[in-house]
Amino acid sequence: MKTIIAEKPSVAREIARIVGATKREEGYFEGGGYAVTWAFGHLVQLAMPDGYGVRGFVRDNLPIIPDTFTLVPRQVRTEKGYKPDSGVVSQIKVIKRLFDTSEHIIVATDAGREGELIFRYLYHYTGCTTPFVRLWISSLTDKAIREGLRKLEDGSKYDNLYLAAKARSESDWLVGINGTQALSIAAGHGTYSVGRVQTPTLAMVCERYWENRRFTPEAFWQLHIATDGCDGEIVKFSSSEKWKEKESAMELYNKVKEAGCATVTKAERKEKTEDTPLLYDLTTLQKEANTKHGFTAEQTLETAQKLYEKKLITYPRTGSRYIPEDVYAEIPKLLAFIGTQPEWKDKVRAKATPTRRSVDDGKVTDHHALLVTGEKPL
């Protein structure tokens, strides 16, 4: 039997349907020679300080730097401290049993740094030695999953990706735990959270806040003129220059007023070409969604993730705005598909030649730029 592990139940359900694992068991699907199970996010995490015998916020305990980090099931906070999440513990038992009884494991967690860490932490925590291979796909369409299953890659290919995620996880722990305890002890009033990302971000917000508070507006004078143009139109002009003193502005104003009319002495017309924008990565999608619709970054990611899980777009957490040649070859089909949708049919030119500006194999990272998949929305 082969075990496939996905990052969440909804993805496991899609993969199970494709491989014929139609029998539902507690914590997994089975059938067709496969067991398809799932995590729900990070089932395993780094232990909190009390897992190393360090309790409370005590100055003499700092810095807390474990010789070896300990992995534990995901914890929930209670009045008496942290304890393992019972649902997580149950799912880990299911996964361990499946891992230990399989000939090999197919890793189908999200194809990215955190998805790799979710599996590797589980793998190490359960003490598993079963060989594993990687399913690496950029969308959840049936076609993409089937192609991915035909082209499974050796798990060791992603060792460096795991090590990068592990370094991120451990650095977050070291900065967060030690920074929070040190600041809270020094301040002496409650708990002050410190984080590797959140604290520099908060500092930037505070810096902008104080820049705004310290800003002193200065009054200026500017010349605005409205004059009759051709065909009874009103033509308005504004001076590019601004004056701090009213007298300087009034001097020019009086000269214009005395002239009584304006004459166009020079007119230029220039033709400019503008490059089409690159395709979206997650960051540019979030920026545009915020500008046009007021979405927060989290709202955009959540919406994109749902569209991905419904097979409508490719992997949303991409950091690339480029696509490889083989994906570019599919773009005419995608444009034709979009043109069949009622709300878009007037916006897509028939047989349009797509631009190649976003085509560059060398600039594609783990995943290519965001694209629609060609699946029709329900």
Give, region by region, the residue ranges found by the protein language model:
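Conserved, well-folded catalytic cores of nucleic-acid-processing
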Residues: 18-22, 98, 105, 125-129, ...
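Intrinsically disordered, low-complexity regulatory segments
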Residues: 1-169, 173-175, 179, 353-354
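Extended, highly charged linker/hinge segments and catalytic-adjacent loops that couple domains
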Residues: 158, 162-163, 174-176, 303, ...
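Long, highly charged, low-complexity internal segments
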Residues: 35, 43-84, 192-305, 309, ...
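Generic beta-strand/beta-sheet core signal
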Residues: 7, 39, 108-110, 226-228, ...
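Short, solvent-exposed helix-loop connector elements
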Residues: 183-191, 376-378
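Conserved short loop/turn motifs at secondary-structure junctions
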Residues: 1-3, 109-111, 188-191, 269-277, ...
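Generic recognition of stable, solvent-exposed alpha-helical segments in well-folded globular domains
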Residues: 6-10, 14, 90-93, 113, ...
